[in-house]
Amino acid sequence: FLGEAKAGMFSIGLSIAQWLVTIAYFEIRTYQVTDVKNEYPFGYYFTLRLMMCLITFLASIVYVVFNGYSPEKVTVILLVCIYKILDSVADTFEGEFQKEERIDMSGKSEFYRIFFSILVLVVTVIITRNLIFSLICMNVVALLIILCLDASVAAGRVKICIVRDYRRVFVLFKVCLPLAISTFLSNYIINSSKLSVDRMLGDAAQLYYTAVFMPNMVIN
């Protein structure tokens, strides 16, 4: 429906987003779900998450500008990055559900968000054959589901706010940093070959490489 070049753009966009979004995730949930003594209220995790999401988006802009991509490719990559950033925001709420031993709520929210986002993406691609418009629709659906299924439910359980105690937020940042660095480097290693193909061979080759690479990655 899209052709080799645009499909390759989407493929490398997903790889870049999966790599850079480790900054947004920052292993915050790992610490959040084990904070059984509630050392940090939800607002601290939420504030740190939003800060890391902003850094992720800025990093994605720097990356695409540094690589000199075409305007269309820049737009595709940034839209995919935004989708993954929205995922990381939802992860904050789902981490709170998990900490309260309601992993079922996390699972339902994640299922609905991913299912309907992909469904909208596929349907709009088939109908419009416009990748950028389809990605915008996917992001809108993901945002609406986060607001309706994550934020609205979490609002009845915790206080959703941005805290001003940046000193404690920085302490939380330092706690999460070692695991975050490990995850960032691991994801870079996984995606480094695809990033090299993108730099050396172009979008069409990226599509074919992904078709070969994906089964091997899943098996490993």
Please report, for each region that a protein language model flagged, where it lies by residue.
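Small-residue-rich midsections of specific transmembrane alpha-helices
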Residues: 6-35, 84-90, 183-192, 210-220
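Interhelical loop/hinge segments that connect adjacent transmembrane helices in multipass membrane
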Residues: 104-109, 131-133, 147-191, 199
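Membrane-interface junctions at transmembrane-helix termini in multi-pass inner-membrane proteins
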Residues: 28-40, 85-112, 132
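Alpha-helical transmembrane segments of multi-pass membrane proteins
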Residues: 14, 19-23, 59-62, 69-93, ...
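Hydrophobic alpha-helical transmembrane segments
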Residues: 74-81, 108-155, 175, 208, ...
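Interfacial/gating helices of multi-pass transporter permease domains
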Residues: 1-21, 73-74, 171-175, 179, ...
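Membrane-water interface segments that mark the loop-to-transmembrane alpha-helix transition
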Residues: 13, 18-65, 75-78
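C-terminal transmembrane helix end/exit motif
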Residues: 29-32, 92-99, 103, 123-126, ...
